[in-house]
């Protein structure tokens, strides 16, 4: 459906994932199977679901996978806030990540709205 490297939303999600890997590298080793693993999994899920949706043959399926990616972004947002509250992640590191996530969520929503219009136009 789309070339991944041309999807700005996918590129931004990849960059976010790299940033999450970097910040979680400094988390306590006791969190290896906790917040480190959960945060990284949620982060990886975002571009992965965008990619899977883009590889599908319908706008409806793509829209569904964007919804899953968006859900993962909210999961990641929550995990990063928890890490901050537990003093594993300072505000200086947290705030840019939250801004990045917020921007990605807005882009995802906008993309979903565009796909929804295409889906509805096909029904006519």
Where are these regions (language model features)?
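Short, C-terminally biased terminal segments at protein or domain edges
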Residues: 1-124
